[in-house]
Amino acid sequence: EVARANELGMDVIITDHHLPQDVVPKAYTILNSKQATDPYPDNMLCGAGVAWKLSCALLARRREAWSVPVGWEKWLLDMAGLSTIADMVPLKNENRAIAYFGLKVLRKSPRLGLKKLLAKMDMPQANIVEDDVGFMIGPRINAASRMGNPIDAFRLLASTDEREAEEFADHLTHLNETRKGLVASMVKEARKHLEARARDN
């Protein structure tokens, strides 16, 4: 995709937080503090944390041109904080701050899809804590990539349509229930094998 974008004269910026491979795409730039040549001091940000830092940098340069109010970027912290907690990166240094302030924004977030998802769980938005994200919200959002199409999670969180948001919240809730059923089945099967081996020994 990057090579094709280059052919079309497009500049591609890649954000990542995984250990880079030996060969990386020839993008305009790659933001990944795990690269050996990257001077950024904190290399434990999750993917959304890296993307949020890019957003802050872009706004620092283009705020007036884009007519973006000072401090608006804090409203993106709901997604950065949610991802930081759900991705289980170490909650220290910048991650700790992103998670802390992300929870504050998450409790006030106007995102329609998030509100619909919380309603499915009977979870009061104003009372969300770290465990809610890690064990309730995060698994439902992650179910999109594990059991279906990852773009569905984006569509849920980006939706501004009541019916669409409701449908995606239902869909992700169903996917998560299916995932839990599969995990329970796999655990049951593994236990049977272990018990059989124990009897044989």
Model-derived segments and spans:
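Short, glycine/acidic-enriched loop or turn micro-motifs at the edges of active sites
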Residues: 19-20, 35, 90, 145
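Short alpha-helices
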Residues: 26-65, 73-85
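N-terminal small/polar loop signature for handling phosphorylated ligands or for N-terminal nucleophile
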Residues: 1-26, 30-33, 189
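Hydrophobic helix-and-loop "lid/oligomerization" segment in the mid-to-C-terminal part
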Residues: 9, 60-201
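Short acidic, glycine/serine/threonine-rich loops at helix termini
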Residues: 1-4, 23-28, 42-44, 63, ...
